[in-house]
Amino acid sequence: MRVNREMTELWSAALGAAGTVIRYGHWGRPVLVFPSERGRAWDFENNGMVDAIGGLIDDGRLKLYCVDSFDAASWSNHDLPLEERARRHGRYESWIVGDVVPWIYRDCNGPAEVITVGCSMGAFHAANFALKRADLIPLAMCFSGNYDPSAWHAWGERGNQAYFNNPVDYVSHLEGDHLEWLRGQLSLLLVCGQGRWEDTTGALDSTRRFAALLAAKGIKHELDLWGHDVPHDWPSWRVQLAHHMPRFC
């Protein structure tokens, strides 16, 4: 790989542990990358995603900041009720907002408009963080996501933690000044194939439904559905990322 690469560990008091962040590039717009379910910071590189946009990185148009997930202890732990999974996700949110984003700002020599990117469960994270913190993240690029955690083997009573981490729920009830602000502040790109595993993961149906919800609320978004020969897998996401990223940096 030709691009500049630096790995660091950022301690999180909320998680009680350090998480890995890998930066790729030397200059450009910061792009915060969430891995797929239970993924690690190096998954993007290992699956060819960094190379797919390596020319943009080399040219100083963007810098990638790839982070660890916390899914194994939160969303992916199906032994826990959904409310507890969402509560545990809150620790991860504290790490991202309280530790990772400030580190990105320092690395960029000041505040900068961050893009979030994610594939599969990473797409959920990219959208959820952008919708909740559009002041920090005005653009989310989401590939093959399922945006409704209540569909993830959910059980148990649901309270505020589950509600405020389910974009389908809280976007449905957005109104007033905050909705008007989001309409002028935020944009989401929703990309999904129609091939193998996009239906069984729920990604295709969820992407369509989420796009319809955003349209009903007047929130800027773009829905890009690829063909029936485009599966829910890394080769698809490499091509889709390389296709879309040049427009935003």
Label every model-predicted segment.
Residues M1-C249:
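Non-catalytic cap/lid and distal C-terminal segments of serine-dependent acyl enzymes
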